[in-house]
């Protein structure tokens, strides 16, 4: 256990901490990516991860989408994914489902939109809370985002920078 500050007996000063804690608020900006495919390996001879998003710039030259429909070239450009609308934003419906589910677990949401990275970066902001509850809110947020993406056959990740050369 940490030692009390010099000249302070064990437990003194704690009411002061609680008094300040009531007036502190926190709401992290937990941006995430939605990917259509994720592969990884960590074995004795190799380590890698590979991600793919149908809206990513590197998919502008593919012949067909994953569902077999023709590629009609609505793809984001590198660092140009901020707030696109469909058909470039392929994730709007899934993000709307995430918003609905986050509201069901009690988070008060402020905004949601596609973020700067072209390959599926998302942002859903929720209202700040006390320090006591902010950690719980973040865990609920991440759980709902992961589960909603998985139910849609996608992968959500909170990795800080999964795409080289793009925002994260």
Where are these regions (language model features)?
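Glycine-rich, acidic/polar active-site loops that bind/position phosphate-bearing ligands
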Residues: 1-168
């Amino acid at each position: 256990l940490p030692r009390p500050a010099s000249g302070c007996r064990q437990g003194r000063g704690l009411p002061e901490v609680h008094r300040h804690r009531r007036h502190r608020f926190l709401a992290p900006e937990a941006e995430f990516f939605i990917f259509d495919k994720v592969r990884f390996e960590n074995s004795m001879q190799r380590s890698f991860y590979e991600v793919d998003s149908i809206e990513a710039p590197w998919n502008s030259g593919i012949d067909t989408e994953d569902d077999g429909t023709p590629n009609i070239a609505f793809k984001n450009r590198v660092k140009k994914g901020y707030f696109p609308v469909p058909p470039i934003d392929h994730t709007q419906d899934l993000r709307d489902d995430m918003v609905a589910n986050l509201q069901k677990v009690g988070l008060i949401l402020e905004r949601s939109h596609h973020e700067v990275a072209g390959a599926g970066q998302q942002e859903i902001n929720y209202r700040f809370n006390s320090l006591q509850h902010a950690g719980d809110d973040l865990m609920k947020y991440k759980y709902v985002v992961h589960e909603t993406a998985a139910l849609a056959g996608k992968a959500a990740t909170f990795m800080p920078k999964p795409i080289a050369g793009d925002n994260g």
